[in-house]
């Protein structure tokens, strides 16, 4: 490959992995903007749009639900709800009307976000460039802001359910008495701080890393001649069909496990 083609390939890869960014301090679109006051417009629109799609599908299923023979959509939604509810009850043993709906929301939202990775790599960016938008990432899971946002929300819930299950005093006490006993309070505190930080970091990086790698492979395959693209892209897409729900399930399952540990820990 020549130097020019290498530059073109690098430019192509960077283009597909760059967000549409709004610099709030300047009020301008800047693809190189970074910092706290920078919004990734494409991630926000795609994630909220997919969340709205999930809500609409379930609302439609509820509206069309009948006591007689259920339709295909109703069957699908009921099967998913029963599966999530059973999974949650096997992990979170306390009574809660929130955990199962929360788990269902996380699974469906992350699943739909991951599913965007199966959309043809150039289709949406080409459409957006045709209407004057230079950058557009359709895959929210390949944005650390999205994955860390989800994991930090889970972290907040861990604190809330820890206090609900143990009380404020019991939750604070567990930081210095668990797991090595009160005589090793400093060591307990250090271990618990590390574990507390590791939970959201591992949740977010696991989801981001798997989907980023998959997206990068799709981009690299798209740089090859068309006849090689089909030979390599098809089996990779088939394999990725398994990865998409698996990563959503892992994120959901770990969330429920962390909440159960926080609520039931003594």
Swiss-Prot record:
Gene Ontology, cellular component aspect: plasma membrane; proton-transporting ATP synthase complex
TM segment ranges: 41-61, 98-118, 119-139, 152-172, 178-198, 216-236, 237-257
Keywords, in A-Z order: ATP synthesis, Cell inner membrane, Cell membrane, CF(0), Hydrogen ion transport, Ion transport, Membrane, Transmembrane, Transmembrane helix, Transport
One Pfam family hit: ATP-synt_A
Compartments reported by the entry: Cell inner membrane
Keyword hit for Aminoacyl-tRNA synthetase: no
CDD domains: ATP-synt_Fo_a_6
UniProt main location, coarse: membrane
A biological process from GO: proton motive force-driven plasma membrane ATP synthesis
GO molecular function per UniProt: proton-transporting ATP synthase activity, rotational mechanism
PROSITE patterns named in the record: ATPASE_A
Topological category with respect to the lipid bilayer: Multi-pass membrane protein
Keyword Ion transport included in the entry's annotation: yes
NCBIfam families recorded: ATP_synt_6_or_A, PRK05815.1-1
Family statement drawn from the similarity comment of this UniProt entry: Belongs to the ATPase A chain family.
Function per UniProt: Key component of the proton channel; it plays a direct role in the translocation of protons across the membrane.
Assembly and oligomerization: F-type ATPases have 2 components, CF(1) - the catalytic core - and CF(0) - the membrane proton channel. CF(1) has five subunits: alpha(3), beta(3), gamma(1), delta(1), epsilon(1). CF(0) has three main subunits: a(1), b(2) and c(9-12). The alpha and beta chains form an alternating ring which encloses part of the gamma chain. CF(1) is attached to CF(0) by a central stalk formed by the gamma and epsilon chains, while a peripheral stalk is formed by the delta and b chains.
Name of the protein this chain belongs to: ATP synthase subunit a
Organism placement in taxonomy: Bacteria, Pseudomonadati, Pseudomonadota, Gammaproteobacteria, Chromatiales
